């Protein structure tokens, strides 16, 4: 069965979203057209507003509606700690976990020479400028534990060599609640290499 040209156009447009295939796009479109046209109008309005007004923080490069995001504007954050992440989603995950009170720098990707993505494409020139300010004492590399993420972390580490800025990497290992028999070999090996002294609670 073929829908009208406008419906077909809507289906095709919905498929630009990650993880949305033909069937999912059809369910979304038909739901909005049949059952929730008001919701569809709100979606269009919100998306239009976001596309029009959301840009990038001039300091950390995360998504923001103002020149500086709320985190960069927060005087309570520790300017000496700078966490480098690949995406705004990674930054949000760290914020939601709580515990980190430093600032961020968002790469919006990782180095990938085969895809033509070099240092300037992920803002490493801007990271150099940020570090040249002198307020950063430690850089925490929180790139993903993938081949590209590791390559990016090593590149940044080379950039920092001789600058006097401390460098650390997020620890990776066995997840809380996980069982060793289900942990892959690479993760288990990294957990052993990054093991810490056992802190016993005083009775």
Swiss-Prot record:
The keyword Cell inner membrane does not apply. A zinc finger (C4-type) spans 57-72. Transmembrane segments: none annotated. PROSITE patterns: RECR, TOPRIM. It holds the Pfam family Toprim_4. Keywords: DNA damage, DNA recombination, DNA repair, Metal-binding, Zinc, Zinc-finger. CDD domains: TOPRIM_recR (cd01025). One of its GO terms (molecular function) is DNA binding. It comes from the Bacteria. InterPro entries: DNA_Rcmb_RecR, Rcmb_RecR, Rcmb_RecR_Znf, TOPRIM_dom, TOPRIM_RecR. One of its GO terms (biological process) is DNA repair. Residues 80-175 form the Toprim domain. NCBIfam families: recR. May play a role in DNA repair. It seems to be involved in an RecBC-independent recombinational process of DNA repair. It may act with RecF and RecO. Belongs to the RecR family. This is Recombination protein RecR. The gene is recR.
């Amino acid at each position: 069965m073929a829908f009208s040209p406008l419906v077909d156009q809507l289906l095709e447009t919905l498929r630009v979203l990650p993880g949305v295939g033909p069937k999912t796009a059809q369910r979304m479109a038909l739901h909005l057209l049949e059952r929730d046209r008001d919701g569809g109008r709100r979606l269009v309005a919100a998306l239009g507003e976001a596309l029009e007004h959301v840009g990038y923080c001039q300091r950390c490069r995360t998504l923001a509606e103002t020149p500086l995001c709320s985190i960069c504007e927060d005087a309570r954050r520790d300017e000496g700690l700078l966490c480098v992440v690949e995406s705004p989603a990674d930054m949000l995950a760290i914020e939601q976990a709580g515990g980190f009170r430093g600032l961020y720098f968002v790469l919006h990707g990782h180095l990938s020479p085969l895809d033509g993505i070099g240092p300037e494409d992920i803002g490493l020139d801007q990271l150099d400028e940020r570090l040249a300010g002198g307020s950063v004492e430690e850089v925490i590399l929180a790139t993903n534990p993938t081949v590209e993420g590791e390559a990016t972390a090593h590149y940044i580490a080379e950039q920092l060599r001789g600058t006097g800025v401390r460098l650390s990497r997020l620890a990776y290992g066995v997840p809380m609640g996980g069982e060793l028999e289900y942990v892959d070999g690479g993760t288990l090996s990294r957990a052993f290499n990054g093991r810490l002294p056992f802190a016993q609670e005083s009775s």
